[in-house]
Amino acid sequence: MRLRHKPWASEELAKRPNLVIQQPEQHKGNWNNCFCTAQPLYVEVGTGKGKFLTGMAKQFPSINFIGVERYESVLLTAMERVEAEKLPNVKLLHKDVAQLLEVFAENEVDRFFINFTDPWPKKKHAKRRLTNERFLTIYKQLLKQDGEIHFKTDNQGLFEYSLHSMSTFGMAFKNVSLNLHQSGMEENVMTEYEEKFSAKGMPIYRLEATFRP
């Protein structure tokens, strides 16, 4: 993905501390205090431009959402989208997924969303895939006992890798789809990439996974 650099992004993000949390480590274990109402907490890693995040937040107002994004220029677009929708149940973090343990406490998150992440197709880059064992270890620590991971991708190789990685890690699956848009899942909210790929007739792969006790 080619990113357009926006040198002003950092300054603009800092102007919205109530939406883009500037020192998220200070809220570790107390994220519900950042929202108007204490509700279940769903986290999207690699939130991109925020289309999925805002769509979910509108559809499920009784859930609090946090979008995590490492690229400031992309996060700026997400911030503008959340502001335009005036969503009280959304916060944004400028963080890398590898830093999640710094900002969330154990058993604090109810659900993780991983949507259309970089497939890192080369074998030597497997550890960078967000469904690799090193990231699953992080998610497991942060999820509540009945917490879930919802994963979507257009990349068949990454999907097969993720099924194997999660299965080897001892996870259980449900609602696995090899062609999401033919599955009749009514509550599906599409990402920017999902709209693009589905318009070309490409299948979207999806799964829900939980960690066994």
Swiss-Prot record:
The active site is at D118. This is tRNA (guanine-N(7)-)-methyltransferase. Keywords: Methyltransferase, S-adenosyl-L-methionine, Transferase, tRNA processing. GO terms for molecular function: tRNA (guanine(46)-N7)-methyltransferase activity. NCBIfam families: PRK00121.2-2, tRNA (guanosine(46)-N7)-methyltransferase TrmB. The lineage of its organism: Bacteria, Bacillati, Bacillota, Bacilli, Bacillales. It is an enzyme of class 2 (transferase). PROSITE patterns: SAM_MT_TRMB. Belongs to the class I-like SAM-binding methyltransferase superfamily. TrmB family. S-adenosyl-L-methionine binds at E44, E69, D96, D118. Substrate binds at K122, D154, T191, E192, Y193, E194. Catalyzes the formation of N(7)-methylguanine at position 46 (m7G46) in tRNA. Pathway: tRNA modification; N(7)-methylguanine-tRNA biosynthesis. CDD domains: AdoMet_MTases (cd02440). The gene is trmB. GO terms for cellular component: tRNA methyltransferase complex. It catalyses: guanosine(46) in tRNA + S-adenosyl-L-methionine = N(7)-methylguanosine(46) in tRNA + S-adenosyl-L-homocysteine. InterPro entries: SAM-dependent_MTases_sf, tRNA_(Gua-N-7)_MeTrfase_Trmb, tRNA_methyltr_TrmB_bact. Its EC number is 2.1.1.33. SUPFAM superfamilies: S-adenosyl-L-methionine-dependent methyltransferases.
